[in-house]
Amino acid sequence: MPLKETTGKVVSDKMNKTIVVAVENRISHRKYAKTMTRTKKYKAHDENNECAVGDIVTIQETRPLSRTKCWTMVNILSKSFHN
């Protein structure tokens, strides 16, 4: 079974070797057919602490690493230019 991969924006990097990634999904409302954006936040493992807030990253599903962390950062698609 292939592992799930998704892309999102880093919203927090305050924890050691852990980042919080916000993933936006566009869905259509069943009744009104309006397109809505749903955001979900995932904690992901960042082994080298190389991500910063604002980076666009790809994360991949993995075995549970802690109580709330079961994703790992695969690569950084674009770096942010924050201080």
UniProtKB/Swiss-Prot annotation:
It comes from Porphyra purpurea. The keyword Chloroplast applies. Keywords: Chloroplast, Plastid, Ribonucleoprotein, Ribosomal protein, RNA-binding, rRNA-binding. One of its GO terms (cellular component) is cytosolic small ribosomal subunit. The keyword Transport does not apply. One of the primary rRNA binding proteins, it binds specifically to the 5'-end of 16S ribosomal RNA. Gene3D superfamilies: Nucleic acid-binding proteins. It holds the Pfam family Ribosomal_S17. PROSITE patterns: RIBOSOMAL_S17 (PS00056). Its main location: plastid. It is found in: Plastid, Chloroplast. This is Small ribosomal subunit protein uS17c. GO terms for molecular function: rRNA binding; structural constituent of ribosome. Belongs to the universal ribosomal protein uS17 family. NCBIfam families: PRK05610.1, uS17_bact. InterPro entries: NA-bd_OB-fold, Ribosomal_uS17, Ribosomal_uS17_bact/chlr, Ribosomal_uS17_CS. One of its GO terms (biological process) is translation. Part of the 30S ribosomal subunit.
